[in-house]
Every structure is written in structure tokens, then in C-alpha cells.
Amino acid sequence: MTPAELLAFLQEFYRETSDLFTSRQNTARSVAGYDANNGYQQVIGRQEVHLRWLSDAIASLGGTAADSADQISGTTSSENVKSIIDRDAGNQKAFVDRWTSIVPMITNARHRKLLELILGEMKEHLRILHQAAESRPDVLGRHADGKVLRGTVIAARPKN
């Protein structure tokens, strides 16, 4: 794989990851359950790191990372939360399945390992999304004292 091909490969991976990220940010606004939303915030935080890593890898090859054309909407969906999360998990699984078979073609060990690490974390995110869809109270773990937190979060901070 030539440096130009590697750059194009990384840019495409970045674009698709960025699209998932933007969609997930929109989806998180409709997931009000405390534990499920905390799971979403965990996944979103890791995806921000993935995008930064990819951007750095692209820059090291002399390229620039193009952000998603989609914008984050401030609206929430009235659709059933389980179906929203299931659709999000389905998109993530399709992404992981597609790229898992392609990444081994990268001959640059550093960039191949980076993408393998990102895909591995994205597989773990699927577990979090599935637990969130089930409305499990232990999406991110259990409290040491057995306490179960309940409640909801707001979709966005109120404007003053």
C-alpha cells in the first residue's frame, strides 16, 4: 500500500467514524435514562479520542481530516428509545464488520494497529449499547454498596 493509498484509506475511515460520531451525539439527546445516557457519554468520549488519533495519523501523512457534513441537531426523537439504540448499534456493527475485513490489508504496522485498536473498542461499545437498549442499571458497572441510581437526564442544557 503506497503512502497515498494509506492516506486515502485513513481519510475514508475517519469520515465514516465521524459520521457515526455525529449520529451518536444526536441519538444521545433522545436517550434520557440515567444509566443508558451515561453509557452513551462514555462511548462518545472514546470516539472523540479515536477521531483525534485518526486526525493525527492523517496529518502525519500530510493530509487533513474532513469532518462529517452532518450537523448535530438540538432535537430529540419521540421514537421508542430501544429502537433508537438498536438502530445505532446496528450502524456500529455494520461499520465494524465492514472495516474488520479491510484493515488487515494495511501494510503499515503502526496504522494497522491503530485501526485494530479502534475497532476493538468499537466492539466493546456494542456491548454498552446493547445493555443500554435493555435499560440495564449496570451499563457502566455496579456500585460497591449495591445502590442503584434511577432517573433521567435532559437532552440539552437550558439556555439562560
What are these regions, as identified by a protein language model?
Residues 1-160:
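Iron-associated oxidoreductase/ferritin-like identity signal
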